[in-house]
A protein has these predicted regions:
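Hydrophobic alpha-helical segments
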Residues: 1-170
Length: 170
């Protein structure tokens, strides 16, 4: 969460560009909740609807070079199930610099986690309606969703503990 806050406040990746990056990952992963939410957020940041449609269709060639490097990497990152080719990551780092590249990676990880939660929730809903998602099981669906529930209070506890003890090891 600290990395996300730092990325958002750092100003190296503006909000519209961050939304474009997240829309590409969401298009690959197919999360309907993230698609809806980030489409609205992208439009609110000034991304034209025509660009949004291209992002959702993964038609990335028309975007300017200063965006297409990150957008094509975002697609590769999602399609490789978070295991990108090191040469592809090196291209992002070389093009944007290490700090901006790390901010881009933070957005990629955040939206991937969001997509996982949304798709897992959909799998659980499908299971309840008698149509379990292929390749999924009740245990993994419940584990992911329950894990997401305890994460915010745990992070709050860690943050409070660090501020009282000054211990950054946790």
């Amino acid at each position: 969460m600290d990395a996300l806050r730092d990325a958002a406040r750092g100003g190296r990746v503006n909000h519209a560009f961050a939304e474009k990056i997240m829309m590409v990952v969401t298009s690959v992963n197919g999360c309907r909740y993230c698609s809806y939410g980030h489409s609205r957020a992208a439009l609110a940041t000034g991304v034209p609807e025509t660009e949004l449609q291209k992002l959702m269709a993964l038609d990335l060639e028309a975007f300017p070079e200063n965006e297409v490097v990150a957008l094509t990497f975002a697609q590769h990152y999602a399609e490789s199930h978070c295991n990108p080719d090191p040469a592809a990551w090196q291209r992002v780092t070389s093009y944007y610099g290490e700090e901006t590249a790390n901010d881009i990676m933070t957005y990629l990880r955040m939206i991937t986690f969001g997509n996982l939660l949304g798709n897992t929730f959909d799998a659980l809903l499908s299971r309840f309606s008698g149509k379990p998602a292929q390749g999924s099981n009740l245990w993994s669906e419940l584990s992911v969703l329950l894990g997401a529930i305890w994460l915010p209070p745990f992070r709050l506890f860690i943050r409070l503990f660090k501020s009282k003890t000054g211990n950054a090891c946790i």
